[in-house]
UniProtKB/Swiss-Prot annotation:
Keywords assigned: DNA-directed RNA polymerase, Nucleotidyltransferase, Transcription, Transferase
Single GO MF descriptor: ribonucleoside binding
A GO CC term attached to the entry: DNA-directed RNA polymerase complex
Domain of life: Bacteria
Signal peptide range: none
Subunit-structure text: The RNAP catalytic core consists of 2 alpha, 1 beta, 1 beta' and 1 omega subunit. When a sigma factor is associated with the core the holoenzyme is formed, which can initiate transcription.
Function: DNA-dependent RNA polymerase catalyzes the transcription of DNA into RNA using the four ribonucleoside triphosphates as substrates.
UniProt xrefs under Gene3D superfamilies: 2.40.50.100, 2.40.50.150, 3.90.1100.10, DNA-directed RNA polymerase, beta subunit, external 1 domain (2.30.150.10), DNA-directed RNA polymerase, subunit 2, domain 6 (2.40.270.10), RNA polymerase alpha subunit dimerisation domain (3.90.1800.10), RNA polymerase Rpb2, domain 2 (3.90.1110.10)
Reaction catalysis annotation: RNA(n) + a ribonucleoside 5'-triphosphate = RNA(n+1) + diphosphate
Any single biological process term in GO: DNA-templated transcription
UniProt-recorded name of the protein: DNA-directed RNA polymerase subunit beta
Entry's family note: Belongs to the RNA polymerase beta chain family.
């Protein structure tokens, strides 16, 4: 097994029982692939597929004028280069976007020509606005901030059948309904009412009988009845009637007369129920026709219109009920044959017939008018309007789009491949007429589609078929970034289309060009609105790498076209069997959004239709193959799937008589030969965050949910430390998040410092004409969206050989390329003087002293100098009211120096604002005359450090509007940036030249020359010494005897010249970007951003947590000498409450503690060996035992001796373990590690009280555990108010830190003071310290005078109460005595 550069430095010992079948896929693939398929930027225009931008353009174009004489056609679109890169956009507050241009063709037709003749064609490129681009890490930079477009889980287009679960009608009768949901267009619903009539409604408007819709599509009553009913045939003979017998139809009925065979034998006696036995006898007797009395016909429904053959008069209409009078009338008219509907109460309801009865429309036109009146009440129905509306509802491609997904879902549901034998004849007839339908088809509805839906719905009401489960993931699909952006772009294009249609009529007369017709503003507005303020475009959670990756893998059921929090019931939020391997059953928010916002499972991906799929290994004849198939929830239902931990023998055959499987969402035991698929990994069902929890299988689900969510809130520590007990996915998360720097190409490290890494690329990885140098600029002390610090640190040394994809620099919360969210702490589970009551945490002072949980937070403070009515504001150092101490930190431009340490209230940027002219007193006039004008007509509006904040200035950025002269500070910042860029280019050039001249030396040494510098003679062989005596660039003056060599030399010279030109050009572009004016908001002349680095040490009140949902607040930081310690004097770092474990049922934390202790002890053992200078072979032997005695074996033999020693020195702080979820370390394996480390079994030791030295009564569980500091810091929450703002109406102090508010003294607090009888304290709280306005002022006066007297008056809130009562027209007055 090949280890990467960073992997071999610290190999994580895995307890997994089986080898990885499928590597974890790239975790951001969903986002990146979706947006790439939307743009298709790298695909040549002719080869672009019809989706994304291409589909949006082709669905709107060509646009024709109203007269049809001019049309605008779309040819292709091009994406330009973005003006600024990601970093520049973030600094300047711009959007990282590409200009979009479309080539369109204006075709003008000759209106006088008899057939379509092109008169004129104009083709032109038109600007269509800007499209935001995705960064390499799957986010967007919008107005300088990173945002994420969250994928949406919405109801798939198609047709769905359901019932109301008996909730609508008091009888509890199930009312069935069907709904056709298009991707775009009107919804069509069909529903039964309690009387079994079928209704339809469009877009949830007023309901109408469904037969109105059937009439509107051109069906008459006879055709409607023939489509949805089978017929019984009768023959009228004089006074009696004969009935064509279909024996099956009689089953279950009670015979109203004796049924006999041809010989007169009674088969079914009168008043007996007809059974299956009777039907068999009738079949055997071959009875085809039986005589029936007239009563048998009464109440039946006529199937077709009956016309008197002589007069042509309609005797009976289809759907008429047979009465005695009608029967006589039919006989009189000489009707011989009669067809009636076959209906019964059990499984052949007369629903369509009943619906026809309540339908008052007479023909197709009347039906369409009725639909028009329902859709457009109050508008007169003209023929054209009625026709246009009806055609536009479901048949027009412009207004209705079922989409390929919708068509696939529709056909699968409405046109089943196999029809059941029990299905009625009318349904079989319908499907035979329609023929088989695949998954493809038109995007609009057809008449057959409507009939098919009604057919399935009627069958459901008849008791055949099943309703759909709307929470099944086969009925919910994911809309990712690309699709959401495409919809938005199309919406913008539709607005453009309307405007273009208007202008096209003028195009011919006014000789317009395409760019005169298209205005890109509506498109830009739609795109800007979507990326800037859509519910699905969210401010990226950037607290740590995991929170970034989880945010991008989130699927939300909320948002436009989705659910709302209030309407979402329990079923939608619940875990569904189809979530298995697709959506994580654990990770979801705890609040009102629970279950509506989910996370993709680790291996999940979306298919071309947007349905979530998960991978399975194919099983053939009990043998597990290496073939991996991705199945969607729709396909999965039909297979029997074994779990990943099913026992397999050496030949890959499933072992055991019965295997635990899943089939159709249920768990079952199946024989090995029935199994068709098998899970790829035990951790397949959970998301990234949940799969980072070791021993997840031992935690209660509620706590696991909290654990998964709290890892996202972990603040990056100053020195990240890898978890001793992990799950093995830490490296994948760190690398895929983009936080750690990966090598783009393999090579040798040429130069390293804290800011950059220069790599000389391997020759075989450099293409012709490419620069063989990669320069990686580290991100240094950059502010994240959550104000945490992003800082990258190189992990390579000069001369290291690295491969493509190797981690060469760590980022925030990563340690040697692995995710490291917290610190490994020595933990003891025991009570300690009540300081760990209610989950509080007791911490050793050593943890704070060693800066273990210290984090750096970066605050951005901004000041702008505007143009005011009284003149421009000025950023300056010249401020009269500031003392020298304040000014000492400012440079001559009035901006703070980098590196200055500042406290609350200190000036960061000096700024003055013009003040309005005021009437001056004579004294002021005199002062003005003496000291000049400047001092009094401006006020100090400098940027100061806000209260409760202190830190170090780490960066300053100055932005100046075009046309305004830059100050010295702004100029020096630009010079520094150019210098840094120039150094990069110089380094690249240096390595390129060095490689080029090394190649020339290899080519020409020993070859003959025709002459050259320093009077080289013809025919002389070139030597290394000769070359060393020349300047490098004079090597090109050597004239080679070999023409081919001369040509190669020339090619190298030209290549170097081109590279130099390219670098010069790049420098000029960069210089132009930096020196041109900045885009600032209107009225802003200059803007200064100051970045403060704030160091936050751990302190009481900070929230901390483990990875198992065990959270608490630091209650006390105890001196190291007072902490409980072990027999050898080692003090513990953290003391936790043991009572927090049993009730929470998160036992995983105890197992982690044990395994962490074994890890540390093994590390100590290795460290002891290294300090004793043990031989590499001895170290290798111990490592073999650790890595290969159990769990997944590691290839120690592939490491050289020096690599083994380096690995061992990295392991001396603890051997990192991986215990993958659901496949982790067993109890015996932990015990084996204890034994190897030389620890006593049981994991408990005697601790001694640090204060007294006495041993505690019982042994205590002690071990190492990964602990996180969460982004709920006491510094951000706690504040104190002295004086501050008051609420306008109640005159009480405001609440909250942002408003500098006070602490609320509420009703219950008042009770507490009342209970103590503290009357004066209470009076003070409710009056002068709150809303007694006059009393407050008097208190201030008395404090100033040095007195301590309180004169409490009337609280303002009482006056408010009085006024409110008066507003209710009640006269209330306060009598004072």
């Amino acid at each position: 097994m090949a280890y990467s550069y960073t992997e071999k430095k610290r190999i994580r010992k895995s307890f997994a029982k089986r080898a990885a079948v499928l590597n974890v896929p790239f975790l951001l693939a969903t986002q990146i692939e979706s947006f790439a398929s939307f743009l298709q930027a790298d695909t040549p225009p002719p080869s672009r597929l019809n989706h994304g931008l291409q589909a949006a353009f082709t669905s709107i174009f060509p646009i024709s004028s109203h007269s049809g004489n001019a049309r605008l056609e779309f040819v292709q679109y091009m994406l330009g280069e973005p003006a600024f890169d990601v970093k520049e956009c973030q600094q300047r507050g711009l959007t990282f976007a590409s200009p979009l241009r479309a080539r369109v063709r204006l075709v003008i037709l000759d209106r006088d020509a008899p057939k379509e003749t092109v008169k004129e064609v104009k083709e032109q490129e038109v600007y269509m606005g800007e499209i935001p681009l995705m960064t390499t890490t799957g986010s967007f930079v919008i107005n300088g901030t990173e945002r994420v477009i969250v994928s949406q889980l919405h109801r798939s287009p198609g047709v769905f059948f359901e019932h109301d679960r008996g909730k609508t009608h008091s009888s509890g009768k199930l009312l069935f309904s069907a709904r056709i949901i298009p991707y775009r267009g009107s919804w069509l619903d069909f529903e039964f009412d309690p009387k079994d009539a079928l209704y339809f409604r469009v877009d949830r408007r007023r309901k109408m009988p469904a037969t109105i819709l059937l009439r509107a599509i051109g069906m008459g009553p006879e055709e409607i009845l023939a489509t949805f009913h089978d017929f019984d045939a009768f023959h009228l003979r004089g006074n009696e009637a004969a009935f064509e017998l279909v024996p099956d139809r009689l089953r279950g009925d009670v015979a109203k007369f004796d049924i006999t065979d041809g010989a007169g034998n009674v088969i079914v006696a009168r008043d007996k129920r007809i059974t299956a036995k009777h039907i068999r006898e009738l079949d055997q007797a071959g009875v085809k026709m039986i005589s029936v009395p007239d009563e048998f016909l009464l109440g039946r429904i006529i199937a077709r219109n009956i016309v008197d053959a002589e007069t042509g008069e309609i005797v009976a209409r289809a759907n008429d009920e047979i009465t005695e009078d009608l029967l006589d009338k039919l006989r009189d008219a000489g009707v011989k044959d009669l067809e009636t509907l076959y209906v019964n109460d059990l499984d052949r309801g007369a629903y369509i017939s009943q619906t026809l009865r309540i339908d008052e429309t007479a023909d197709q036109w009347a039906a369409r008018v009725a639909i028009y009146r329902m859709m457009r009440p109050g508008e007169p129905p003209t023929e054209d309007a009625v026709e246009a509306l009806f055609q536009g509802l479901f048949y027009s491609e412009e207004r209705y789009d079922l989409s390929s997904v919708g068509r696939m879902k529709f056909n699968r549901r409405a046109y089943p491949e196999k029809i059941e034998d029990k299905a009625p004849s009318w349904l079989k007839r319908f499907y035979e007429t329609v023929g088989p339908r695949g998954e493809e088809g038109p995007a609009t509805l057809s008449n057959e589609d409507i009939l098919a839906v009604i057919g399935v719905l009627v069958e459901l009401r008849n008791g055949r078929g099943e309703i759909d489960d709307i929470d099944h993931l086969g009925n919910r699909r994911v809309r990712s970034v690309g699709e959401l952006a495409e919809n938005q772009f199309r919406a913008g294009l539709v607005r453009v289309e309307r405007a273009v249609k208007e202008r096209l009529s003028q195009a011919e007369s006014d000789n317009l060009m395409p760019h005169d017709l298209i205005n890109a503003k509506p498109i830009s507005a739609a795109i800007k609105e979507f990326f800037g303020s859509s519910q699905l475009s969210q401010f990226m959670d950037q607290t740590n790498p995991l929170s970034e990756i989880t945010h991008k893998r989130r699927v939300s059921a909320l948002g436009p076209g989705g659910l709302t929090r209030e309407r979402a019931g329990f079923e939608v939020r619940d875990v569904h069997p189809t979530h298995y391997g697709r959506v994580c059953p654990i990770e979801t928010p705890e609040g009102p959004n629970i279950g509506l916002i989910n996370s993709l499972a680790v291996y999940a991906q979306t298919n071309r239709h947007g349905f979530l799929e998960t991978p399975y290994r194919k099983v053939v004849d009990s043998k597990v193959t290496d073939q991996i198939d991705f199945l969607s929830a729709i396909e999965e239902g039909q297979y029997v799937i074994a779990q990943a931990n099913a026992e397999i023998d050496a030949d890959g055959m499933l072992e055991g008589d019965l295997v635990s499987c899943r089939h159709k969402g249920e768990f079952a035991l199946s024989t090995a030969d029935q199994v068709q698929y098998m899970d790829v990994a035990p951790g397949q069902i959970v998301s990234v965050a949940a799969s980072l929890i070791p021993f997840l299988e031992h935690d209660d689900a509620n706590r696991a949910l909290m654990g998964a969510n709290m890892q996202r809130q972990a603040v990056p520590c100053l020195r990240p430390e890898k978890p001793l007990v992990g799950t093995g996915i830490e490296r994948t998360v760190a690398v895929d998040s983009g936080t750690a720097v990966q090598a783009m190409r393999g090579g040798i490290v040429d130069y390293v410092d804290a800011n950059r890494i220069v790599v000389r690329v391997n020759d075989d990885e450099t293409l012709a004409g490419e620069v063989g140098v990669d320069i990686y600029n580290m991100i240094k002390y950059t502010r994240s969206n959550q104000n945490t610090n992003i800082n990258q640190r190189p992990v390579v040394k000069v001369g290291d050989h690295i491969g493509k994809g190797d981690v060469i620099a760590d980022g925030a919360s990563t340690d040697l390329g692995e995710l490291a969210l917290g610190q490994n702490m020595l933990v003891a589970f025991m009570p300690w003087n009540g300081y760990n009551f209610e989950d509080s945490i007791l911490i050793s002072e050593r943890v704070v002293a060693e800066d273990r949980f210290t984090s750096i937070h970066i605050e951005e403070l901004t000041v702008v100098a505007r143009d005011t009515k009284l003149g421009p504001e000025e950023i300056t150092r010249d401020i009269a009211s500031l003392g020298e101490a304040q000014l000492s930190r400012l440079d001559e431009s009035g901006i703070v120096y980098i590196g200055a340490e500042v406290d609350a209230g200190d000036v960061l940027v000096g700024k003055v604002t013009p003040k309005g002219e005021t009437q001056l007193t004579p004294e002021e006039k005199l002062l003005r005359a003496i000291f000049g004008e400047k001092a009094s007509d401006v006020k100090d509006t400098s940027l100061r450090v806000s209260s409760g904040m202190n830190g170090t200035v780490i960066d300053v950025q100055v932005f100046t509007r075009e046309g305004i002269e830059r100050d010295k500070r702004a100029q020096s910042i630009i010079d520094d940036m150019l210098r840094s860029f120039k150094t990069d280019l110089a380094d690249q050039m240096r390595i390129v030249e060095r490689d080029a001249f090394a190649r020339i030396r290899r080519l020409i040494v020993g070859q003959k020359a025709n002459g050259g510098p320093k009077k080289l003679l013809k025919g002389t062989a070139i030597t290394g010494e000769y070359l060393d005596s020349l300047e490098f660039y004079h090597w090109f003056d050597i004239r080679m005897a070999d023409e081919e060599l001369a040509a190669q030399l020339e090619a190298i010279r030209e290549g170097l010249e081109k590279t130099r030109k390219d670098f010069d050009q790049a420098f000029e572009i960069k210089k132009k970007k930096l020196t041109q004016g900045d885009e600032l908001p209107p009225g802003v002349q200059k803007m200064v951003k100051v970045y403060l680095a704030v160091k936050r040490r751990l302190q009481p009140g900070d929230k901390m947590a483990g990875r198992h949902g065990n959270k608490g607040v630091v209650s006390r930081i105890v001196p190291i000498e007072d902490m409980p310690h072990m027999a050898d004097g080692t003090p513990v770092d953290i003391v936790l409450n043991p009572l927090g474990v049993p009730s929470r049922m998160n036992i995983g934390q105890i197992l982690e503690t044990h395994l962490g202790w074994a890890s540390k002890a093994l590390g100590n053992k290795i460290g002891t060996m290294l300090r004793a200078n043990a031989a590499a072979a001895e170290v290798r032997e111990l490592l073999e035992h650790i890595y290969n005695d159990n769990g997944r074996p590691e290839d120690m033999g592939s490491l050289k001796d020096d690599e083994v020693i380096e690995l061992a020195s990295n392991l001396s702080k603890g051997v990192p373990f991986a215990t993958p979820v659901f496949d982790g370390a067993k109890e015996e394996e932990i015990e084996a590690m204890f034994e190897l480390a030389g620890l006593q079994p049981g994991g408990q030791v005697t601790l001694y009280d640090g204060r007294t030295g006495d041993a505690f009564d019982r042994q205590v569980t002690v071990g190492y555990k990964h602990v996180l500091k969460l982004h709920h810091l006491v510094d951000d929450k706690m504040h104190a108010r002295s004086t501050g703002p008051y609420s306008l109406v109640t005159q009480q102090p405001l609440g909250g830190k942002a408003q500098f508010g006070g602490q609320r003294f509420g009703e219950m607090e008042v009770w507490a003071l009342e209970a103590y009888g503290a009357a004066y304290t209470l009076q003070e709280m409710l009056t002068v310290k709150s809303d007694d306005v006059t009393g407050r002022t008097k208190v201030y006066e008395s404090i100033v005078k040095g007195e301590h007297k309180i004169d409490a008056g009337m609280p303002e809130s009482f006056n408010v109460l009085v006024k409110e009562i008066r507003s209710l027209a009640i006269d209330i007055d306060l009598d004072t005595y």
